Structures are given as C-alpha cells and as structure tokens.
Amino acid sequence: MTDNQSYKIILNPTSGRGSAGRAVPQIENLLRAYGLNFEIVKTEYPWHAAELARKATTDGFDVVVAAGGDGTVNETINGLMDAKEAGNLLPALGVLSVGRGNDFAFSMGIPTELEAGCKTLASNQRRCIDIGRVVGGLYPQGRYFGNGVGIGFDAVVGFEALKLKR
C-alpha cells in the first residue's frame, strides 16, 4: 500500500511505562513498509501533544496520529479542535495504541496490537466521530473529549490518581 497523504505521528515516549518510546523503530519500519509519508515527533511535557497537533494542522498534514494512550489521544484531540476553532481545516485523527489506557481505541474498534494498528492506519478507513466539550472548573476556556467525561466522584478519583506514583 502506498499513500500520498502526509502523516504527523505525535508519540508520547512515556506512554505504557516507556513502551511507546521503545516502539519507535517498529512503528517506523511498519509505516515505511506500508509506504506512508510520515514524520514522528515525541512529546516532551504535559499538553505538548496539543501544541504539536495544532502545529501539524497549520502545517497542512492530512492525518495527525496520536501514538500513546488515552491521555495522548485527548491532548491531540484538544489541539486539533483548537486549530479548527482558529479557522484551519481539520485533518483526520489516527490512533496507534502504545499506552496503558486505550479506551478510546477500543471504543472506536482500533486494534490495540501495534502491527494491526499500523495496517489499519494505512488502510485509510475513516469515519466521523462526535467530540464533546466541557467548560468550567479547572478549564474555564473549555476542554474537548472524544470518548467520555467524568464528573463528581469520577473526576475526583481521576485527579487523585494523577498524584499517585506509577
């Protein structure tokens, strides 16, 4: 398969307790084998994926791929939607599951095995998805979500879990 589209792979090297960073050579080999035109960039700090997704959108990439877990996907969605709000054309979102939490990929039917995920990405199958936005609390400017949002007890558990050492 060859594809003339441009893919920006936003990879969180700390996803999956570092397994995402170790998977870079395999990802590169698989995407090359499928003939994809891609660039991989690694996140370096929290919310960097959102910044990289915004830039990839303004740079004109056709597909922006979140390579990580649910956190990387969420940040990437937020960056894409921010770029759309600024008047940019929205690229397609791709996901490579290399994190610990892959609920978004699971709910979308995206394979969580890396080779199958790369094959799915190369197949160029697309569908529209709903994106929600929550405004308030810690996010007065709003924050987007792709597969779920927690409020009340669920949100407290999420914030407390962030404090735990992994």
Language model region names:
Residues 1-67, 74, 78, 115-116:
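ATP/NTP phosphate-donor binding region
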Residues 19, 41, 68, 109, ...:
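Catalytic cores of large soluble enzymes that bind and process phosphate-bearing ligands
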